[in-house]
């Protein structure tokens, strides 16, 4: 009897938590990655959901399109070596698209501000 009562209580507790979590996520249009008004996903890669101004997403797309023209495959880092005047963007771990140092600084600031540009449910 005690085991049955404990199992019933546990199932109620578990069911309560299960019901509360999806309700919170469902209230956000894009789940936990929903951006505040005026912001969009940067999409430096398909999984990059840092919320930025639309102009920054446009710049990231342009950087991706020009990526091959900014590398020196014979450099110290092989196919990931940037030509002079460019550095890795580092929008996310493994992002080796070459950009200007100023642009990398902007991307780092965007990453640091990620919680402020996202709707917190």
Question: What are these model-predicted stretches?
Answer:
Residues 14-23:
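C-terminal segment of classical bacterial N-terminal signal peptides
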Residues 26-121:
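Post-signal/leader-peptide non-cytosolic segments of secretory proteins
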Residues 1-8:
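Bacterial N-terminal signal peptides that target proteins for export
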């Amino acid at each position: 009897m005690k085991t049955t009562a404990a199992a019933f209580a546990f199932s109620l507790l578990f069911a309560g938590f299960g019901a509360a979590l999806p309700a919170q996520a469902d209230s956000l249009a894009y789940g936990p990655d929903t951006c505040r008004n005026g912001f969009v996903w940067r999409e430096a890669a398909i999984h990059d959901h840092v919320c930025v101004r639309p102009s920054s997403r446009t710049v990231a797309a342009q950087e991706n399109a020009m990526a091959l023209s900014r590398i020196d495959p014979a450099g110290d880092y092989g196919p990931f070596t940037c030509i002079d005047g460019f550095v890795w963007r580092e929008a996310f771990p493994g992002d080796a698209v070459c950009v200007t140092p100023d642009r990398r600084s902007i991307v780092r600031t965007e990453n640091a501000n990620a919680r402020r540009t996202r709707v917190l449910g």
